[in-house]
Amino acid sequence: MGAAVTLNRIKIETGIADIRDKYMVLDFNYPEYNRAVRFAEESYMYYYETSPGEIKPKFCLIDGMSIDHCSSFIVPEFAKQYVLIHGEPCSSFKFRPGSLIYYQNEVTPEYIKDLKYATDYIASGQRCHFIKKDYLLGDSDSVAKCCSKTNTKHCPKIFNNNYKTEHCDDFMTGFCRNDPGNPNCLEWLRVKRKPAMSTYSDICSKHMDARYCSEFIRIIRPDYFTFGDTALYVFCNDHKGNRNCWCANYPKSNSGDKYLGPRVCWLHECTDESRDRKWLYYNQDVQRTRCKYVGCTINVNSLALKNSQAELTSNCTRTTSAVGDVHPGEPVVNDKIKLPTWLGASITLVVISVIFYFISIYSRPKIKTNDINVRRR
């Protein structure tokens, strides 16, 4: 039978990135039980926020400790703007009270709780947590008055900032479901917060024919077009007989086989300029701007009928102006006449010069000379 697990050594090491962070290295007689428990001991005086609107010192307030320990880490001038609230649960070494044990890897609240004799050395508490006074609001009625802008006289900034933060999202979600055409709801939607877009996507999936859904589609395209496409798909799937849906959800028929190209370019429900873009999927909206079609007007001056035949002649080719939406692509660049580059001209000049040089050499008359006899002794 093996020997019992015993603790051989405890070593405290200081962190590198933050001097407040430390490691308690526990060495056992069996290496597989070795642990490095990370914890913090607060030493800073806070004059800044750890996250927007709140300060969370690295201090675990255990039972029997005064709450003054928490406030001792904030400079007095800064502390006047904040209040202490009930913080998250934490664990602290009793022999180093106030230390904050980090929960990570194998070290979890359950792991500490299951340790034998853990309560003799580790205590539970709440982490110090301060929140800005401006972030507090009394009751739901006050939230309603601030978020609906009924009375903003005494509203904190976070509830009176034109919906730039998420603090009014919960209220506006319910409020706008009951009154989606309210100007404040449309203002909330124009900020393009995802809760707002999701809310209107759900509303327009039941009431796409309402005017506020036109504004909804205008706002979300092109960045968040999926919210609108989802609403249109659900609405048209539930209202297949609605003629407005015939471009997005055309009734099954063979008539479409007679035409070339996507139906968004020839179907009246798609091509009519009076059509609201909300009845088109985003890709159809883009496609319609690229459609090119030619129309003409037929005037019948005379019509000849012979037995069961009618003969009509019309010249439609005279009207060549294209009608429809302007193509959003890049403008066409006319091809320019390509002129020879300086490099090409230089090479050509050198070649011509060499040719003329050799021609001039070989065209000269031969120089007459006298033969000289040389005899070597």
Curated annotation (Swiss-Prot):
Intravirion compartment residues: 363-377
Chain segments annotated as transmembrane: 342-362
User: Which topology term describes how it sits in the membrane?
Assistant: Single-pass type II membrane protein
Extract one GO molecular function annotation from the record.
DNA binding
Biological process annotations from GO: DNA-templated transcription termination; membrane fusion involved in viral entry into host cell; symbiont entry into host cell
Q: Which UniProt keywords apply?
A: ATP-binding, Disulfide bond, DNA-binding, Fusion of virus membrane with host membrane, Helicase, Hydrolase, Late protein, Lipoprotein, Membrane, Myristate, Nucleotide-binding, Phosphoprotein, Signal-anchor, Transcription, Transcription regulation, Transcription termination, Transmembrane, Transmembrane helix, Viral envelope protein, Viral penetration into host cytoplasm, Virion, Virus entry into host cell
The post-translation modification note in this UniProt entry reads:
Most cysteines are linked by disulfide bonds. They are created by the viral disulfide bond formation pathway, a poxvirus-specific redox pathway that operates on the cytoplasmic side of the MV membranes.
Known partners and oligomeric status = Part of a stable entry-fusion complex (EFC) which is at least composed of proteins OPG143, OPG147, OPG155, OPG086, OPG094, OPG107, OPG104, and OPG099. Formation of the viral membrane is necessary for the assembly of the complex. Interacts with OPG094. Interacts with OPG153.
Q: What is this protein called?
A: Virion membrane protein OPG143
Q: Gene behind this chain?
A: OPG143
